[in-house]
């Protein structure tokens, strides 16, 4: 059973960890079970990164609203479990 990875502290940390996983997988030296575990962790990190980027994009869109007099709506990120 694969270990449940803790959430990385930041987007940059998650990206660096994902890059390391890709390097290990591309080496072709991992046993099948370990490669599958690494792949699973990589998918989770990629999804987390994608969600973080989507939230950042939403925040930017709120800040760049075309109507300068429009009140800013507070940003509330979704609390989805990955």
Curated annotation (Swiss-Prot):
HAMAP family: Exonuc_7_S. Its EC number is 3.1.11.6. It catalyses: Exonucleolytic cleavage in either 5'- to 3'- or 3'- to 5'-direction to yield nucleoside 5'-phosphates. One of its GO terms (cellular component) is exodeoxyribonuclease VII complex. Heterooligomer composed of large and small subunits. Belongs to the XseB family. Bidirectionally degrades single-stranded DNA into large acid-insoluble oligonucleotides, which are then degraded further into small acid-soluble oligonucleotides. GO terms for molecular function: exodeoxyribonuclease VII activity. It is found in: Cytoplasm. One of its GO terms (biological process) is DNA catabolic process. This is Exodeoxyribonuclease 7 small subunit. Keywords: Cytoplasm, Exonuclease, Hydrolase, Nuclease. InterPro entries: Exonuc_VII_S, Exonuc_VII_ssu_sf. It comes from the Bacteria. It holds the Pfam family Exonuc_VII_S.
């Amino acid at each position: 059973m694969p270990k449940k990875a803790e959430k990385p502290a930041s987007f940059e940390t998650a990206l660096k960890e994902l890059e390391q996983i890709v390097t290990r997988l591309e080496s072709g030296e991992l046993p099948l079970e370990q490669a599958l575990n690494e792949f699973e962790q990589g998918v989770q990190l990629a999804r987390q990164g994608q969600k973080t980027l989507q939230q950042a994009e939403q925040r930017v869109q709120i800040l760049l609203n075309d109507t300068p007099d429009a009140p800013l709506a507070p940003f509330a990120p979704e609390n989805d479990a990955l």
